[in-house]
Regions:
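Short, acidic/hydrophobic/Gly-rich beta-strand patch recurrent on exposed beta strands
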Residues: 37-42, 160-163, 228, 357
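Short, conserved phosphate/pyrophosphate- and ester-handling motifs at nucleotide-, phospho-/glycolipid
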Residues: 54, 178, 300
Length: 469
């Protein structure tokens, strides 16, 4: 071990004296956005992946910057009572989960404090507005969608997960947060690739064929499989079909997708249906949805239902309201709202999502819905000029939050209630502050744990029009 220096022994460190490859004793006080422990040596911030709040650890400095350093966890001198042994054997290297070394109770507390912090610090509101996080009944084996990358590991074909912060493949045979049906698909694909010597894609040389194996599990346990290749043809296509039919009877739909472009986008524009049904049927809040390879659908159905039910409660619909669902996606929230509203207008800039929304509305006989493929920030003022006055506006934007145009249009339409669903507490807090300046006030914020074992937390919030608005 390198020379060990203690931050607890009364020594005062000038940040310039914290040296690369030196070991220091660090008291961990919090977790960062990626799940890393945050501590300091006399005011100089040290990030220590794998460390938990309340722990005292020894860490060797592996990266040194002017205002912070990153340390490798060498040993734990004082262990948190909330530390547990992760279920996943590759947890420390995989980038998929960040909190599996923390008890579920500890995860919920951390997420609650994270939401409360940004509401106080960014929105300038009281943390008392934040309710306790709604937990998942099953914090493992909850994901109904899997997309496993293929690649080379020491020259050999492999399926697995990406190493944290890179695209290096870590071979795995199962994932603790995936449904069992997806893990069986993963194990079959590993055996198949090895048995038939399937060519896998190498990102560095851009050669090889198989890039991803995707599985989607429906409510009834039936599975859709999508095999993604860089090549126009699927190596051993007939054997893939025969093998899946023989070994995976739960699979009812098989597709071949072609993605020749480098980058992080998994699915390409070209796709071939190989066998079985073209869609899966999934339900959400009593509604039926047809799920295609390209469709967005919530990967944790049970928690999505809890989230949507809370959003519906905040909307407080009595049957005569007009509702706008900005960022409506494939219409899942819109259709839930339509069960209790007089009229629902869904707006989404992605045309394919609007096509799915219209199909889903027809399937569920929701004739009081309208869907527009448009920029909500531009369409909403047009609708207002045409006489549309919404009682409620619901928004569920991407992680970047709402555009300025959507926030301005929302305030201009003057709805009684705004229901804001967010996958990023920080951008919600930013947008809430803007809406507050327009005369709206936050009544309540409900975090929901959609993705146990990870740093992600969803929130749904109710904002109402102030008396002076």
């Amino acid at each position: 071990m390198k020379n060990r220096k203690s931050g607890d022994a009364g020594m005062k460190y000038d940040p310039a004296q914290v040296r690369i490859h030196e070991a220091y004793t660090v008291a961990i006080r919090d977790l960062g956005v990626h799940g890393e422990g945050i501590g300091s040596v006399d005011g100089f911030t040290i990030f220590v992946p794998g460390a938990l709040p309340g722990e005292t650890v020894t860490a060797e400095i592996t990266l040194l910057k002017k205002s912070y350093a990153v340390g490798e966890l060498l040993s734990i001198e004082w262990e948190s009572p909330f530390r547990v042994v992760p279920k996943c054997p590759v947890y420390e290297n995989c980038g998929g989960c960040q909190l599996s070394h923390l008890t579920y109770e500890g995860q919920l507390d951390m997420k609650y404090r994270r939401v409360k912090d940004v509401i106080e610090r960014i929105a300038g509101e009281s943390g008392d507005l934040v309710k306790p996080v709604l937990p998942a009944a099953h914090p493992f084996a909850y994901r109904n969608k899997m997309a496993v990358p293929a690649g080379l590991v020491k020259g050999e074909a492999a399926l697995g997960c990406y190493r944290q912060g890179s695209h290096d493949i870590i071979p795995v045979s199962s994932c603790a947060i995936q449904k069992e049906e997806n893990n069986r698909l993963l194990q079959f694909a590993r055996r198949f690739i090895e048995k038939y010597g399937i060519s896998v894609y190498d990102e560095k040389t851009r050669k090889g064929s198989l890039r991803h194996v995707m599985g989607r599990v429906g409510d009834d346990g039936k599975v859709m499989v999508v095999l993604v290749t860089a090549s126009e043809t699927l190596p051993e296509e007939k054997r893939w079909i025969e093998g899946i039919q023989k070994e995976l009877p739960e699979v009812i739909s098989l597709w071949h997708n072609i993605q020749p472009k480098p980058g992080n986008t998994i699915l390409g524009a070209k796709i071939r249906h190989l066998w079985g049904r073209e869609t899966l049927t999934a339900s959400l809040c009593g509604l039926q949805f047809e799920v295609s390879p390209y469709s967005f659908f919530q990967v944790h159905k049970e928690q999505a239902e809890i989230l949507y039910e809370k959003a519906l409660a905040y909307a407080d619909l009595q049957g005569g309201e007009t509702v706008i669902d900005a960022y409506c996606g494939t219409g899942t929230i819109s259709l839930c709202l339509a069960k209790k509203a007089k009229r629902v207008i869904g707006i989404e800039i992605v045309k394919s999502a609007i096509e799915d929304a219209k199909k889903n509305a027809k399937k569920n006989h929701m004739e009081n819905t309208e869907f527009y493929a448009a920029d909500a920030g531009k369409l909403m003022p047009q609708l207002y000029r045409q006489g549309l006055v919404p009682d409620v506006i619901v928004m569920d934007p991407v992680r970047a939050g709402c555009s300025e145009e959507v926030l301005k249009a929302t305030a201009g339409m003057n709805p009684k209630r705004i229901v804001y669903v967010s996958c990023n507490p920080a951008t919600f807090a930013r947008d809430a502050k803007i809406l507050k300046s327009e005369g709206y006030e936050i009544k309540e914020i409900q975090p929901v744990d959609m993705f146990p074992q990870t740093m992600h937390v969803e929130t749904v919030a109710l904002m109402i029009r102030g008396k002076s608005k």
